[in-house]
């Protein structure tokens, strides 16, 4: 395993620094996959290789401005609120093309594709429909001329279904590491 995703900025930065010090030759790739607040964007821009959760132009602009010029462009994915859930972050499907056009031209960022997290209450048919809709949005953006290569969707409980619907990246932390223990956070 060399690709790791983190939901929490400070926890992720601690792990990144630990592994860079402990194994400087190792080629780990670090993905930030959680919601990102403006006040933590600099840490993400300076430490992570990917951000899978771009949900606002403001965050994309901050990451672009804060990415050190000595580092490669930050790989980013636009998070889509595919089920239109009020409690979830993400761009509405109808607003997707507008933000894609803006983010694609920002310096220091490389827009690689899209990410979604379907409703936790969705049954298999609903998840399949959400993943199929995401694949359709992904292909639409490609037809509009964007060089997307990454469709991140599916987690431990539904990754096989996501792959079946076209995911190129899945997030399977709990399937590998077990359920997260929040008692000592």
Predicted regions mapped to residue ranges:
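Conserved alpha/beta-domain cores
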Residues: 1-157, 165
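Expand to "…catalyze enediolate/carbanion chemistry for C-C bond making/breaking, isomerization
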Residues: 161-164, 172, 176-183
